[in-house]
């Protein structure tokens, strides 16, 4: 006969991953992420030594969203399959990876690009870096990496969902919060070495990617002209 002072099972009503070891929880989270069709990523990531704030919706064949460099430019990215577009304001295009004072001609040319979807070709030096922000597989492989001995950390709630944390290297190698309700998706990652914090939401929620209308696009065939980040 159970007494009224009996403690409630902390895993009651959960998916059960809270009972697993840290390595098992991490493996479940990784498997869930790999099997998802779509996700929304928001937070801070470090790429090639530079810090970027991102808010991207991603799926298998592309992605769309906003990227802003720390103390630097803000721009929008849209990718459908191999077609990558960048949208930014005139100030972004006026500087386009160049320093110093801009000429009147530079400013005039930049004004024509403001608010347009500029095609970034695969030959552009920045194509690989920019397209990585829109590639679900590439981003998830890079983000879901912990370094050091794993242990089960604290439980909390993220976006109203109960989570359990996997901690690596006593926290210095990263912290991954995994959903305890529904599929064990990773919901938040604090990357090791101060390399950013990213939240993951809307797992499996499909969305439509649309190619910009012809009048909204500019095809910059000149190598290096379509990015503004080639020097990053």
Report residues per predicted region.
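Gly/Pro-enriched, hydrophobic low-complexity segments
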Residues: 153-216
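N-terminal leader/targeting segments and the immediate start of mature chains
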Residues: 1-53, 214-216, 221-232
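One face of beta-strands
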Residues: 37-45, 50-67, 73-77, 82-86, ...
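An acidic-aromatic
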Residues: 59-131, 196-200
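Sec/Tat-exported extracytoplasmic proteins
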Residues: 33-37, 88, 121, 147
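A short, amphipathic edge element
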Residues: 143-151
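Transition segment at domain starts
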Residues: 131-142
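Surface-exposed coil/turn segments at beta-strand junctions on protein surfaces, enriched
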Residues: 34, 70, 157-159
């Amino acid at each position: 006969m159970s007494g009224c002072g009996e403690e409630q099972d902390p895993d009651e009503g959960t998916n059960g991953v809270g009972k697993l070891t840290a390595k098992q929880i991490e493996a479940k989270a990784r498997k869930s992420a790999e099997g998802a069709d779509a996700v929304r990523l928001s937070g801070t990531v470090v790429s090639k030594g530079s810090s970027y704030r991102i808010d991207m919706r991603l799926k298998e064949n592309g992605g769309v969203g906003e990227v802003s460099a720390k103390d630097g430019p803000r721009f929008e990215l849209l990718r459908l399959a191999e077609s990558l577009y960048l949208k930014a304001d005139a100030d972004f295009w006026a500087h386009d990876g160049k320093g110093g004072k801009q000429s009147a001609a530079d400013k005039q040319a930049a004004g024509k690009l403001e608010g347009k979807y500029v095609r970034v070709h695969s030959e552009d030096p920045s194509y690989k870096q920019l397209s990585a922000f829109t590639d679900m597989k590439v981003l998830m492989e890079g983000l879901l990496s912990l370094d050091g001995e794993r242990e089960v950390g604290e439980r909390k709630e993220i976006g109203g969902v109960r989570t359990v944390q996997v901690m690596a290297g006593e926290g210095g190698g990263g912290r991954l919060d995994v959903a305890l309700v529904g599929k064990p998706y990773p919901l938040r990652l604090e990357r090791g070495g101060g390399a950013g914090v990213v939240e993951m939401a809307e797992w499996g929620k499909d969305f439509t990617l649309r190619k910009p209308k012809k009048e909204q696009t500019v095809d910059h065939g000149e190598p290096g002209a379509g990015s503004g980040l080639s020097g990053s």
